[in-house]
Amino acid sequence: MFRILLFLATNIAVVLVASVTLRLLGVEPYLQGSGLNLTSLLIFCAVFGMSGAMISLFLSKWIAKMSTRTQVIEQPRDAVESWLLDTVRELSSEAGIKMPEVGIFPAHQSNAFATGWNKNDALVAVSEGLLRRFSKDEIRAVLAHEIGHVANGDMVTLALIQGVINTFVMFFARIIGNIVDKAVFKNENGHGIGFFITTIFAEIVLGILASIIVMWFSRKREFRADAMGAKLAGSGAMIAALQRLKAETQMPNEMPDTLTAFGITEGVKQGFKALFSSHPPLDERIAALAANR
């Protein structure tokens, strides 16, 4: 409920700020005079912007299973699978959530992810590489980290943030398109080619800039998931797991782009590219855990 209220409050705040800004700049009267209704435009953008994010959220488990070829453990076939189920059951109980589905996906890289539309209908999966190279304590810490994502409602939070971002990227791109169409292309009869070209270009540019905001939120929630992992599995085990991941940073990332934000780690990014990273540097995560031991 808090996240929904936060989402609504964010929308209202941005609408008010946008309205005041457009009035102060003298843009709103011009737009209304050219036939562009801001309220209708915002509703249109909100419907499409939020719909895309929500559809992705509700389909996230299915998409994750298909894109990673994850095999959900229905009946354990060996001692490792039995241990995985028991460990996830124990951790989810400690975190106060319903036990998620547990799966294994084929990848040499050590990684794991959690996804699902709510904390009581989630999926936690680990790679074959992680099971081969990590100790049980380290695997438990990684699972605790992913359970932390689920318990914190990170999938829902990021979907809501992405929906808000989608809405306002569409909204402001169309305002820019309308201004350019009227002022530069001198089109007074509906929307001309200038509107469509400018809108597409503006959506691309604004979308790239907006993704920096989404990734900033993503990096912040990684610290929270690490803290939950340390709480459930112990700081020592969580730090050891991250240190082992650090030793594998040169390995290619086999996680689909759509799931990178929900993995335990991603490839190292430097300079400007770091702004688009969904995970903080492993050294920063290790330092944060060490400081709170």
UniProtKB/Swiss-Prot annotation:
Name under which the protein is recorded: Protease HtpX
Biological process terms in GO annotation: proteolysis
GO molecular function: metalloendopeptidase activity; zinc ion binding
Residues annotated as binding Zn(2+): H145, H149, E222
Pfam families reported in the protein's UniProt record: Peptidase_M48 (PF01435)
HAMAP family: Pept_M48_protease_HtpX (MF_00188)
Protein EC: 3.4.24.-
Parts of the chain that traverse the membrane: 2-22, 38-58, 156-176, 193-213
Cell compartments where the protein resides: Cell inner membrane
Record GO cellular component, one term: plasma membrane
Annotated coiled-coil segments of the chain: none
Cofactor: binding details: Binds 1 zinc ion per subunit.
Gene3D superfamilies, per database record: Metalloproteases ('zincins'), catalytic domain
UniProt main location, coarse: membrane
Keyword Zinc: yes
